Amino acid sequence: KSSENSEIKAIIPESNKTTGNIGVEYLIFKYRLNIYEEHFFPIKHNLLGLKGSKINEIKNVYSHAQALSQSSNFIRKYNLNENVRADTAGSAKYISENKDKTKSAIASLLSAEIYNLEVLQKNIQDDENNVTRFLLMGKDIYQPEFNKGDFLTSFLFKLKSKPAALYSALSGFALNGVNLTKLQSFPEKNSFSSFFFLCDI
């Protein structure tokens, strides 16, 4: 919707301190979204189950792929079967409706409150200081006031797959002392002969 309506903005998770890139490059390319701001939020994961359930009863855990990956140590410790769902809140809702005490969800404390679930264990993420970078994105192009501070610039470019193509494209940044904080590649649709690159400088 944010690609069609200027009044609607999207907040998208871009990368995580523990698991790395989450993957928003296709959104920027497919929907021609512009990045306005970045925000870093601490992420706390919690194991939720039905009221009265116990951790030693749990056999299956449901959540978003990122939440599962960021809680892998806990999952291995309790030998839980992972089940990937679209999002964490939806996983909590599924547990509340399923009525099976062997199933659990990794989600927020707010989800536990909304869906009347038991918090079986708080802060199960691998990294105590787990942080995710979010991007505020939208349709319109906004020109920042460059005299009011430092800014990060994100941009896309495309190269054919041939020797030294990437080196030639990026050497100018090195020669001029420009620091690249992100460089990510993904293939052009239906082709591996050319690639798009997403950069932050």
Segments (PLM) and residue ranges:
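Domain-level signature for soluble enzymes in the chorismate/prephenate branch of the shikimate pathway
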Residues: K1-I201
